[in-house]
């Protein structure tokens, strides 16, 4: 079983944990529809950066 050789101080422990915080997904609002979506992703209705890039409903 692993046993530490020297006790880690609260400061060292907290410095190690400083990178453990979780962040939520970054959301953007579409300029055309006002819909929220993930950054650098197409919205559900097919718009990306104000342009229609996917025609949903027309299966070719």
Swiss-Prot record:
GO terms for cellular component: large ribosomal subunit. This is Large ribosomal subunit protein bL32. Residues 7-16 have a biased composition (Basic residues). Keywords: Ribonucleoprotein, Ribosomal protein. PANTHER family: 50S RIBOSOMAL PROTEIN L32, LARGE RIBOSOMAL SUBUNIT PROTEIN BL32. It comes from Cellvibrio japonicus (strain Ueda107). Pfam families: Ribosomal_L32p. GO terms for molecular function: structural constituent of ribosome. Residues 1-28 are annotated as: Disordered. GO terms for biological process: translation. Belongs to the bacterial ribosomal protein bL32 family. The keyword Ribonucleoprotein applies.
């Amino acid at each position: 079983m692993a046993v530490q050789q020297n006790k880690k101080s609260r400061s060292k422990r907290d410095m190690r944990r400083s990178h453990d915080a979780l962040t939520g997904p970054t959301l953007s609002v579409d300029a055309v529809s006002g819909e929220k979506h993930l950054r650098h992703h197409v919205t559900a209705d097919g718009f990306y950066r104000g342009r229609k890039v996917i025609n949903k409903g027309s299966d070719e």
